[in-house]
Amino acid sequence: MSIKVIVAGFKGRMGSTAVEMVKGDDELTLAALLDPFAAEKEVDGVPVFTDKADLVGFDADVWVDFTIPAVAYENTHFALENGFAPVVGTTGFTEAQIQKLTDLSKDKSIGGLIAPNFAIGAILLMKFAAEASKYFPDLEIIELHHDKKKDAPSGTAVKTAELIREVRESKRQGAEDEMETLAGARGAEFDGFRIHSVRLPGLVAHQEVIFGAQGEGLTLRHDSYDRISFMSGVNLGIKEVVKRDQLVYGLEHLL
């Protein structure tokens, strides 16, 4: 049976790419599109909605969300309340929000996924970085994205940092008397190490984790040159959440 999918934020770069992915998979059916700024009533026979309240009672299985951080939590909560398994690529969630959504999914026995990054290579980078941090505890994260990205640091950088924190002995890096002569020069601090955000036109999504030790260094890097790189993960997420009974944070939990 085909999985019926709603795509929220379908007019954005990621949303429009997700629409094409769903349309190209015989196991998926594009059931509805949502965007508050949409002027059209339908696209290729698929109904378009501007208000999610109009989707109450709608016949669909999965809610794919590529909107903006300001509405992503509310959208995901709405999806769970109305029986749609959410697959969310929008970033900017707090730990408290993720916990509330996880608890709600358990109450509803509905699967779901919030993923800072859907590229398989990025997931591997996170895993490799966490493993390396056991042996190279001095590190810094540099994430680079297009200049239209609203949140910083990226969800991928935060997730990478969280995975590292789970296995790395906490320590404060740098000189004890370190002083910034220009505020923010050292980046954001997370568990004693630093995260840096770069925003430039022409970039898509890139991240490197740099490790340093006496006499040697190690650099791990992943590059997404095109948004199509995320679609294999989105596709996997859609097909997996309908089999599960609670929301997970991170695509690695479905691999």
Swiss-Prot record:
Per the annotation, which location comes first and is thus the protein's main one?
cytoplasm
Q: Which residues bind (S)-2,3,4,5-tetrahydrodipicolinate?
A: H146, G155, T156
Q: Name one GO biological process term.
A: lysine biosynthetic process via diaminopimelate
Q: What class of enzyme is it?
A: oxidoreductase
Q: What Gene3D superfamilies does this protein map onto?
A: Dihydrodipicolinate Reductase, domain 2, NAD(P)-binding Rossmann-like Domain
List its EC numbers: 1.17.1.8
Q: Which SUPFAM superfamilies match?
A: Glyceraldehyde-3-phosphate dehydrogenase-like, C-terminal domain, NAD(P)-binding Rossmann-fold domains
Keywords (A to Z) from UniProt = Amino-acid biosynthesis, Cytoplasm, Diaminopimelate biosynthesis, Lysine biosynthesis, NAD, NADP, Oxidoreductase
The superkingdom listed in its UniProt entry is Bacteria
Q: Which cysteines are joined by disulfide bonds?
A: none
UniProt-listed CDD domains: DHDPR_N
Q: Does the keyword Chloroplast apply?
A: no
Give the subcellular location. Cytoplasm
Which Pfam families does the record associate with it? DapB_C, DapB_N
Q: Which GO terms describe its cellular component?
A: cytosol
* Keyword flag NADP: yes
Reactions that this protein is recorded to catalyse: (S)-2,3,4,5-tetrahydrodipicolinate + NAD(+) + H2O = (2S,4S)-4-hydroxy-2,3,4,5-tetrahydrodipicolinate + NADH + H(+); (S)-2,3,4,5-tetrahydrodipicolinate + NADP(+) + H2O = (2S,4S)-4-hydroxy-2,3,4,5-tetrahydrodipicolinate + NADPH + H(+)
Q: InterPro entries per the record? A: DapB_C, DapB_N, DapB_N_CS, DHDPR_bac, NAD(P)-bd_dom_sf
Hey, which pathway is this one from?
Amino-acid biosynthesis; L-lysine biosynthesis via DAP pathway; (S)-tetrahydrodipicolinate from L-aspartate: step 4/4
Task: Provide the residue positions that the database annotates as binding NAD(+).
Answer: G9, F10, K11, G12, R13, M14, G89, T90, T91, A115, P116, N117, F118
Q: Which GO terms describe its molecular function?
A: 4-hydroxy-tetrahydrodipicolinate reductase; NAD binding; NADP binding; oxidoreductase activity, acting on CH or CH2 groups, NAD or NADP as acceptor
Catalytic residues, per the record, are H145, K149
Q: Which family does it belong to?
A: Belongs to the DapB family.
Q: What task does this protein carry out?
A: Catalyzes the conversion of 4-hydroxy-tetrahydrodipicolinate (HTPA) to tetrahydrodipicolinate.
Please report the name of this protein according to its UniProt entry: 4-hydroxy-tetrahydrodipicolinate reductase
Organism in which the protein naturally occurs? Streptococcus thermophilus (strain ATCC BAA-491 / LMD-9)
Recorded name of the encoding gene = dapB
